[in-house]
Amino acid sequence: MKPTRHIAWGALLGPALSACGPAPEGEELDLSSQEQGLEAGCTALSPSIASHSCLHANTSADHVAVTATSGLTASTPSLTGTHKQFDVTLPAGATGTVKFTPGTTGSWAFYLNKSITFTAKSGATTLSSALAQAVSTSCGLTNYTVYNLTAGTTYTLELGTASGNLVGVIPERVEDYNTRYYQDADGDAYGNNNVSILSACVPPAGYVTARYDCNDSNASINPGAAEIPGNSVDENCNGSLSN
């Protein structure tokens, strides 16, 4: 993940990237990262994505029943839309096939509620996953696999055998959950406005979400510190030496 400089482009921002997904912090958005795949060095997605997926897993109105086919056929169904849990019925004791066409280019995480094999294909080509991890959630999701996908391309998803021949699948576009993290060089839990990364992954050590540290080399100086009047030091970073 490459640090980026502060960019004061608040006026260029559009609305939140999804109706129920979190919007990244406005005035420092790195617009180019919204179209890139999963960044190098990402070892795990932010737990906030799984938490959001659980909202859909726990909401009956967000569940959509789909019956997979045995292999790709003319009747193979598509997982259409986002912010849904697709309850996919598989062929008895066999692998099931569904289709998925992303509306936006980027990294797509597929959260599952059973630990089964999960493969994405473009035509006859099996895609390499960008990331695959087990996950512990309160709603029963067990793992996710991330693929870098192109908008408008129809992919084939193959789901391995599952107990009860049923598995829940929740597709989430990873970039919709980008969060701005700031370098905290002095370890006081407040970061440097001018050194930050935009990521939907677990941040590297030394990066935090709080900012406005006016001296990131001194842990006693930050927005949460008590001001000491009369010492010519702005301890609480509010621009005043007296309060």
Segments (PLM) and residue ranges:
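Non-catalytic, beta-strand-enriched accessory regions in extracellular/secretory proteins
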Residues: S75-W108, G140-Y147
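Surface-exposed beta-strand/loop patches in noncatalytic accessory domains
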Residues: Q85-P91, S115-L141
